[in-house]
């Protein structure tokens, strides 16, 4: 058994993990008790990492035009085709689209090639979709992209405000640290500002369920209240302009704008002003807005104005969504940045040209994410290299992105997964290393750099992203500038650039790490930057503007760009769920992570369910002017009337019409370019199909285009849930006949079941009824492993249920131990009255703790019924 200290590849908390690999290859993961981000804690996704390292579905060799190729062939094809486009159309016709999943070394290589040697700044990243407004907010206020807070500040604050953040699900380990800090300090107060009542509200002393998109008005009103209280410092540039705008935002105006009772707002304002220490945690609910940058600055303004900044337990804390979004920001992996916190200014341009030894350096900012794919659609960008991300799923207006890629003359992808919604458009495909195989560094939300270490050999012909970029650079004729042989060399160059001609003028500086030996780099302990060679003082109090001052940015709150009408009367919000990550290429392969929420759902308030005749558990079509999706209805009091919520994760690999981004328009913030993903006007209507069914098969089945399907996680077989309006199953019978399989059919009323066999081996099973068929999926899975050996058992299998089978477990609440609602309900009825008692009896909530808010909700509901 070998053990390797590394980091989790999911959210921006940046947890340390210890990966243990057995001689036969099995991997298990536990939290690293020495890592300062998590001190041994893990969420359910992190705890399941050992179940994601298999090679099923992996891209393991290069391809060119759909045919397997050698590495020399694929690299030569990429180099020659890129060179032809550059020579004919210029460097602006080329673009890279990268990912917060990349390691810093990979990011650095890509940024250097695009900006430094191809000569255009058209390199952007999926981080544009999650935190570019936060970057803009920090740069406008502080003069640099500096996150001025730490996790210890969260634990040591008197008042923690979470706005636009469901940290319990999206940043679960940081949430657990906050929950523990609140238990240790009962005087700590927690305020959650969110239109939805989420799991994060479990520890909230106050929940402000404001109108979607109205956060800016709430914080501008708070600035006015701070000024009125006299607790204000105006020693900042533009302070008077910001205060002048805020003066119009009295309690009545804020209450009307936010849809909140006046007293709730007044109480929150008094609490914030009175708290000796206050910290505000904000994330996608703030950033993903057409006015996200202004909302970020409204938050920063109140912290500056009342002195709750630059000291322990205080500050505006943007939580990043991805494991290395921060690393991408540090290297300059956004089209609006240059490199190492340098900008497109004459001194910085000359400095970077000297360091890189390049005469081709891009001189102006490039195309941001939404702009980039629009330019591809117009034919202006003729080559795009997509690295470690799935923009057909993650960008707004998915259909337009697909159409753009379909028309693009050259699409290159580097990825670990063979089949994605984006990958089907690729002309050249490079197999990249995945977590556990690649080695480098990442930076978490609190500026902490950690090593991500390899503990498995590269599979097939997969290679590191930095290596792929360097070899393509070589094919383009720039090999001498990319002659790295090890990721340590890339990191050293990146670190050296951060300290180059930097005597305290630039905030980002890790020049003190530039001379690490390979052994020292490999053993690098987690460290927060700066790590400078310079003796210049560094402080979050410092303003990084030329005058050295901080700024309060004047903010005029704007209503959401999405407006409802008679045709689209509801506002749609999209976001993360507890057990899935991004587009599910990793987490979707783990059966236990698919138990909690296993298909696209739409959360609806009870009043809206009644108004639009929606039924719990039934399917509904959600429409916008851009498209349509299908999801299962979930009715709950946590949803604000007039609003819907849909998870962002599902895509064409997991469901037909399951992509929420089909519905989103490409509306962006004018300052940051970040899309508005939280507010879209939609309509909803129940869809009652003629039948529903379950399909299990050993091999892919070609489904008619008219069928709606959702893929379930299953090991060794394919499991689909289906629904349709056409009752004919002739297509399935004919397909099974072509395979030469023997069939058993049971038909009666609206029930139609089929088993298909080959030499005694179960190949396919189909169960359908007017409503969801009552089957025992676990028993069916077992029948594929060990087929029933007599006619009676086969007949029972054809019914889908064995005799005496227990009632279904209900929806899984605890994914760690597969504990369902039924068992929890029985334990409550048997006398369990606390989450601790439930954990003692069933183990639920005793591992990662992510399910504890739901355990509390079930306890409250069951005890209220008693």
Swiss-Prot record:
Residue ranges annotated for the 4Fe-4S Mo/W bis-MGD-type domain, each copy included: 1-57
PROSITE patterns noted in UniProt: 4FE4S_MOW_BIS_MGD, MOLYBDOPTERIN_PROK_1
Entry keyword Cell inner membrane: no
Cofactor note: Binds 1 [4Fe-4S] cluster. Binds 1 molybdenum-bis(molybdopterin guanine dinucleotide) (Mo-bis-MGD) cofactor per subunit.
InterPro entries per the UniProt record, alphabetical: Asp_de-COase-like_dom_sf (IPR009010), BFD-like_2Fe2S-bd_dom (IPR007419), BFD-like_2Fe2S-bd_dom_sf (IPR041854), CT_Nitrate-R-NapA-like (IPR041957), MoPterin_dinucl-bd_dom (IPR006657), Mopterin_OxRdtase (IPR006656), Mopterin_OxRdtase_4Fe-4S_dom (IPR006963), MopterinOxRdtase_cofactor_BS (IPR027467)
Keywords, sorted A to Z: 4Fe-4S, Iron, Iron-sulfur, Metal-binding, Molybdenum, Nitrate assimilation, Oxidoreductase
Enzyme class: oxidoreductase
Pfam families: Fer2_BFD, Molybdop_Fe4S4, Molybdopterin, Molydop_binding
Induction line: By nitrate or nitrite during nitrogen-limited growth.
Family named by the database record: Belongs to the prokaryotic molybdopterin-containing oxidoreductase family. NasA/NapA/NarB subfamily.
Protein name: Nitrate reductase
Species assigned in the record: Klebsiella oxytoca
């Amino acid at each position: 058994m070998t053990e390797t200290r590394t980091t989790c590849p999911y959210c921006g908390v940046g947890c340390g993990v210890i990966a243990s690999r057995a001689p036969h290859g099995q991997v298990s993961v536990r939290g690293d008790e020495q890592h300062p981000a998590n001190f041994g804690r893990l969420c359910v996704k992190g705890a399941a990492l050992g179940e994601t390292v298999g090679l099923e579905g992996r891209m393991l060799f290069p391809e060119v035009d759909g045919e397997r190729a050698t590495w020399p062939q694929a690299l030569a094809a990429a180099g020659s085709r890129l060179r032809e486009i550059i020579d004919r159309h210029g460097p602006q016709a080329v673009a890279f689209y990268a990912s917060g999943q990349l390691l810093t070394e990979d990011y650095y290589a890509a940024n250097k090639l695009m900006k430094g040697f191809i000569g255009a700044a058209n390199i952007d990243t999926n981080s544009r979709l999650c935190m570019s407004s936060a970057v803009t907010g920090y740069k406008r206020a502080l003069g640099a992209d500096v996150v001025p807070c730490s996790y210890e500040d969260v634990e040591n604050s008197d008042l923690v405000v979470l706005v636009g953040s469901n940290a319990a699900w999206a940043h679960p380990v940081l949430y657990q640290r906050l929950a523990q800090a609140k238990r240790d300090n009962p005087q700590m107060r927690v305020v959650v500002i969110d239109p939805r009542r989420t799991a994060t509200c479990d520890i909230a002393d106050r929940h402000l369920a404001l109108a979607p998109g109205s956060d800016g008005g709430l914080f501008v009103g708070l600035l006015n209240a701070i000024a009125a209280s006299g607790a204000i410092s105006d020693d900042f540039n533009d302070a008077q302009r910001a205060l002048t705008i805020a003066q119009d935002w009295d309690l009545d105006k804020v209450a009307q704008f936010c849809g909140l009772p006046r007293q709730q707002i007044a109480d929150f304002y008094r609490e914030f002003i009175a708290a000796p220490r206050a910290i505000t945690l904000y994330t996608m609910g703030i950033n993903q807005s057409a006015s996200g940058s202004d909302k970020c600055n409204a938050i920063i303004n109140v912290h500056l104005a009342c002195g709750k900044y630059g000291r322990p337990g205080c500050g505006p804390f943007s939580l990043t969504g991805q494991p290395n979004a921060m690393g991408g920001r540090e290297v300059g992996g956004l089209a609006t940045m240059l490199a190492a916190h340098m900008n497109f200014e004459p001194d910085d341009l000359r400095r970077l040209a000297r360091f890189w030894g390049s005469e081709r350096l891009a001189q102006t900012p490039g195309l941001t994410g939404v702009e980039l794919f629009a330019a591809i659609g117009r034919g202006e960008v003729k080559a795009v290299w997509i690295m470690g991300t799935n923009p057909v799923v993650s960008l707004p207006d998915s259909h337009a992105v697909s159409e753009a890629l379909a028309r693009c003359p050259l699409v290159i992808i580097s990825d670990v997964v063979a089949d994605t919604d984006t990958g089907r458009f690729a002309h050249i495909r490079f197999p990249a290393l995945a977590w556990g195989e690649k080695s480098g560094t990442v930076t978490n939300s609190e500026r902490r750099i950690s090593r991500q270490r390899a503990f498995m050999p590269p599979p097939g012909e997969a290679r590191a992203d930095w290596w792929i970029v360097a070899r393509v650079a070589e094919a383009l004729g720039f090999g001498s500038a990319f002659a790295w042989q090890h990721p340590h060399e890339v990191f050293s160059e990146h670190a050296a650039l951060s300290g180059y001609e930097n005597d305290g003028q630039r905030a980002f500086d890790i020049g003190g790490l530039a001379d690490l030996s390979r052994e020292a780099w490999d053993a690098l302990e987690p460290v927060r930057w700066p790590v400078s060679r310079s003796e210049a003082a560094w402080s979050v109090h410092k303003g990084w503007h030329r005058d050295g001052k901080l700024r309060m940015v004047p903010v005029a709150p704007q209503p959401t760009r999405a407006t409802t009408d008679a045709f689209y009367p509801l506002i749609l919000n999209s976001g993360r769920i507890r057990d899935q990550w991004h587009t599910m290429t990793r987490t979707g392969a783990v059966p236990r992570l698919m138990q909690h929420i296993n298909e696209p759902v739409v959360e609806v308030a009870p009043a809206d369910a009644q108004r639009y005749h929606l039924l719990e558990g039934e399917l509904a079509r959600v429409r916008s002017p851009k498209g349509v999706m299908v999801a299962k209805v979930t009715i709950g009091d946590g949803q604000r009337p007039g609003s819907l919520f849909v998870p962002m994760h599902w895509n064409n690999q997991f469901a037909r019409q399951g992509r929420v981004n089909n519905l989103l328009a490409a509306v962006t913030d004018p300052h940051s370019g970040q899309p508005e993903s939280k507010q879209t006007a939609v309509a909803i209507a129940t869809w009652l199909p003629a039948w529903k069914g379950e399909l299990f098969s050993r091999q892919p089945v070609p489904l008619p285009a008219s069928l709606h399907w959702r893929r379930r996680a299953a090991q060794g077989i394919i499991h689909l849930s289906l629904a349709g309006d056409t009752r004919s199953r002739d297509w399935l019978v004919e397909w099974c006949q072509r395979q030469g399989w023997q069939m058993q059919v049971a038909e009666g009323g609206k029930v139609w079941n089929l088993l298909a066999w080959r030499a005694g081996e179960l190949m396919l099973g189909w169960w359908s009824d007017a409503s969801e068929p009552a089957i025992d999926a676990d028993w069916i899975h077992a029948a594929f492993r060990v087929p029933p050996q007599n006619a009676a058992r086969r007949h029972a299998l054809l019914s889908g249920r064995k005799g005496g089978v227990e009632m279904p477990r209900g929806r899984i609440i605890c994914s760690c131990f597969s504990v369902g609602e039924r068992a929890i309900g029985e334990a409550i009825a048997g006398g369990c009255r606390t989450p601790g008692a439930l954990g003692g009896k069933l183990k639920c909530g005793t591992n990662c703790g992510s399910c504890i808010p739901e355990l509390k909700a079930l306890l409250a509901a069951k005890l209220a019924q008693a």
